[in-house]
A protein has these predicted regions:
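Shared catalytic-loop signature of beta/alpha-barrel
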Residues: 1-93
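C-terminal extensions of enzymes
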Residues: 77-116
Length: 116
């Protein structure tokens, strides 16, 4: 095929429903789906929730591959600050937030600080 991996951004490619359709189409053609994640903790949480419901990618070798998730570590003052509990990784593992909705709670005071 023309590609082995696709990386749509959940927040820019139509949201959770559209990206699920993209992931299903990718799986039908044996293409790995890894979301591109850039922006705030809200987008990070959305992409994590999407990845949590996708079946494991099984490449042509028929050995299921562990999920790969882009986790940006560049300085970004807003990304984690707007979450009451930041999403972090430890030893290459990210805990998926398990609260209602996306699993996160927005820090409204932080939103006020960053409001233009």
């Amino acid at each position: 095929g023309a590609m082995d991996i696709i990386q749509p951004d959940t927040c820019a490619a139509g949201g959770l429903t559209e990206c699920r359709k993209i992931a299903d189409m990718a799986a039908a053609f044996g293409v790995r789906y890894n979301p591109h994640v850039w922006g705030t903790g809200i987008g990070l949480a959305a992409s994590l929730q999407l990845m949590a419901v996708l079946p494991p990618h099984t490449p042509p070798s028929l050995a299921p591959a562990d999920p790969v998730f882009e986790f940006d570590r560049t300085e970004h003052p807003i990304r984690q600050a707007i979450l009451s509990e930041p999403i972090e990784h430890a030893r290459g593992v990210i805990r998926i937030p398990d609260g209602p909705g996306l699993g996160i709670e927005i820090d409204r005071a932080a939103l006020e600080r960053f409001r233009a």
